[in-house]
Amino acid sequence: MAPRSRRRKHKKPPPVIPMIEIPPTEVSPVSPALSKPGPSIDALGFISLDNNVPGLSQLILQKLNMKNYEEYKLVINGGTPVSSFGFRCQQEMFQKMEDTFRFCAYCKVLPHGLSNCKVLRHCKRCRNVYYCDTECQRSDWPAHRKVCRELRLVAVDRVMEWLLVTGDFVLPSGPWPWLPEDIQNWDTWFSMRGLQLESTLNALLGSHSMTMLWASLGRPRPDPDVLHGSLKRLMTDVLSRPLTLGLGLRTVAIDVGKTGGSTLHVVGASHVETFLIRSGDYDELGYMFPEHLGFHVIMVGVDVATDLLQSSSSLSLEPGTIQLSGHRALYHDFWEEQIETGILAHPDLVAAFHPGFHASPGLMEAWLPTLLLLRDYEIPTLITVYSQQELEASLQILVNLDTHIIACGANPFASLKPEQVYSNPNKQPVYSSAYYIMFLGSSPAN
């Protein structure tokens, strides 16, 4: 993210909606009562909430004063919200968002299903799961005790993330003072940023924004070391994608110093990836390759946020700059319309963050033309997943498609921010881009 002096000015943040990010392993068949969302991982994720907690998706819409998912999607895409949508103050916003987590983690009952003598109370340790009575909490403890500590981090991060939305949390930036080849993981990255990082975090901890944030929640502010840790986790979550792209470029030794710059495609880009993205969010990729002559990062997917959509062909790439743009389409359609026609250059690298094609036949059907295209055109391709289980399932699919796997394993630049499975809070939290796979063309002939 660019320093404050370089960031474009933003209007007052729009009314915030809870962004529902469901790990792909939770996506399951769509209920017949709901319209088929197509190849949208965002829509599938939202609808699948009801599989674990019946009625949860409607509770979320109710708290936002919305009738259906179409209204929800309209607003997060920048459309005009219904007149009843919005929050009168920040305190109300946080309360409404917290209300969307209010269901019994054991019996799955929602607030409207409680008897008159019962009330949902949160776990006092993590403040992140709710129970309708002590019996449910006692019965759930064997499962919850395994994740309680991590879910406490999730609860803090969920609040602190608002500082990224408002722009109060500006990540440290600027050319790397160390040699790029010395930065191999988060430990070396944090060591390199050193005093600059500590100065940024300490200034934010003592800021008026931080004070008002916790005051609006109406609960005690955590200790400084807890908040410090949260800010560092959020930082890795923002920077994980650009640095993972850099990992891909390093793996296949792409010549980033070529005339005209390099083109990177992020395929299957979700709304979560592109909502509120800022021009400086990928600057760290440039610092990773100080000799680069320009990066054009194009995000392609059916859920790309409206603010990112623009005509990529009209942008001239200046040496040393990074340009972000988006196209709302399936990748193989985008390829036919933009690449085969010569409007845009062939990509040097293609990346898919959590494509989820292993989890749903519908998603696999949508991804198959893209995977075959990338294989047949021998485009270096990077894929990230949440877990070892997803890694193994995705590898098997790619092997069955006869792709040539050139690298895979734990991602040294995985996000360190734990992600709670929304409708199944006692499921082990996952971490974005925890593992990666790279393939290039077809498997060599035996």
Swiss-Prot record:
Gene3D superfamilies: 6.10.140.2220. GO terms for molecular function: zinc ion binding. Keywords: Metal-binding, Zinc, Zinc-finger. A zinc finger (MYND-type) spans 104-148. Zn(2+) 2 binds at C123, C126, H144, C148. It holds the Pfam family zf-MYND. Zn(2+) 1 binds at C104, C107, C132, C136. InterPro entries: Mito_gene_expr_regulator, Mss51-like_C, Znf_MYND. This is Putative protein MSS51 homolog, mitochondrial. It comes from Mus musculus. The lineage of its organism: Eukaryota, Metazoa, Chordata, Craniata, Vertebrata.
